[in-house]
Amino acid sequence: MSDNEGEQFFDIPKNALDRVEARTMCPREDGKVVRKQAPLKEEPRLEAEQKRSPKKQEKPRGMLPLEQLVLKYVVVVCSLDALREFGGLIAQIRQSHQADMTRHLEAVATEHRANLQALTKSQQEHEKVSKEILSAVISIRSNLNENSSPRHKPLDLDQVNAERALGFGVGYRTALNVFGKLRGITPEEAGSQEVKNMAIREAEEDEYEGSRSFFKKVLDMVKKTMR
């Protein structure tokens, strides 16, 4: 084998030795490749111990939850003082909660009473309005029934008195006119038909400011009486 053939045969890449030494775990003299240390065998044992379930602590029987909680975190010597302080704190919290709840309930009750009073007042107003509406409906219905009735409405008392006063005034004026024209006529001639007709004409010709239909009825009654 020539020198060239030997060089070609032993022409090894630079990193080949590194790979070989890494596989054989043999460090080089120049210290470029560090030997890996094998993992400790104690770690699996520690992990196994950690995975073991701890022993359950037996709870003392016949004790309140607060006592058990205090004994869990406080030394037995100080447990009585801790229980006393915790009990007082819980009592204060309970009293404060009860006071807040009482104030809240009183505020709610006051609000409910105010709402109830407002509702009662509103109902009374609605009842009043309903009564007024019902009264108006009854009045309208009564007026409609009276207007649709064929019977004539009776005259009002004041209206009747006014008509009588006007009739008396007309009759008085007529009597004065007739008396003025009958001067010089004897009582025997006063009852004659001619005198009666003259009185009727004076009554018909007199001016009357009232109802003509009412005056006509009165005049017809006078004619019937005098004839």
Swiss-Prot record:
It comes from the Viruses. The keyword RNA-binding does not apply. InterPro entries: Rhabdo_M1. Keywords: Chaperone, Host cytoplasm, Phosphoprotein, Viral RNA replication, Virion. Residues 24-60 are annotated as: Disordered. It is found in: Virion; Host cytoplasm. GO terms for cellular component: host cell cytoplasm; virion component. Phosphorylated by host kinases. Belongs to the novirhabdovirus protein P family. Non catalytic polymerase cofactor and regulatory protein that plays a role in viral transcription and replication. Stabilizes the RNA polymerase L to the N-RNA template and binds the soluble protein N, preventing it from encapsidating non-genomic RNA. Homotrimer when phosphorylated. This trimer is stabilized by binding to the L protein. Binds soluble protein N, and ribonucleocapsid. This is Phosphoprotein. The gene is P.
